Amino acid sequence: MPPLAWADDRAAAEAYAQGQGVLFLTPHMGCFEITAQALALRFGAQHGQLTVLYRPARLSALNEVMALARNRPGLQAVPTTLAGVRQMIKALRAGEAVGLLPDQVPPEGMGQWAPYFGKPAYTMTLAARLALQTGAKVVLIWGERLPWGGGYRLHTQPLGHELSPNLETAVVQINQAMETMVLACPQQYLLGYDRYKAPRKDA
């Protein structure tokens, strides 16, 4: 694994200490894959595994291979199915952590249209639902790519305010939090990801 450094892990440590479950949110920015591995290394032994989602392969025979590739000590990958969502809820209620990319465009019927940088974007409701249903603490995190192969620097911060109990408003608040993160270091935003695409219909 490439070198990892933490700019600040205080938000994560304080959220774990409250024992209510932690929901880590990261946009398509920097190296989002490294954030899950870094969290598992830093907090897994003390606070239990981090649960993340993966989209199952079209060829079912590949799913076991994909799961084995993603799973490692302190990290569990679950499919983007109802069973996977249930595992995430179970983990949060047990005081463990879950990681999500809330700017991932969900399948049709699993999101709502909400503003993102001034344009309507189909936005998942899952992140807001998980936080509201379980009382999990929301922490923002991203993995900064360091120059010249120097590894990664992890940044965490609290959401900064309570999510609205209204789901639609909470989804907008999460989009706003993602915007703030991107604006802090826009050169590391993955512009190749089509945030404004129409949702797929194969939910």
Where are these regions (language model features)?
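A short, well-structured juxtamembrane/interface segment
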Residues: M1-V22, G30
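A conditional alpha-helix N-cap/helix-loop micro-motif detector
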Residues: P2-W6, L59, V78-L82, P120-A121, ...
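Residues in well-ordered beta-strands of folded domains
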Residues: A7, L53, Q157
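Residues immediately flanking
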Residues: D9, T26, Q104
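Well-ordered alpha-helical segments embedded in enzymatic catalytic cores
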Residues: A11, I34, G84-Q87
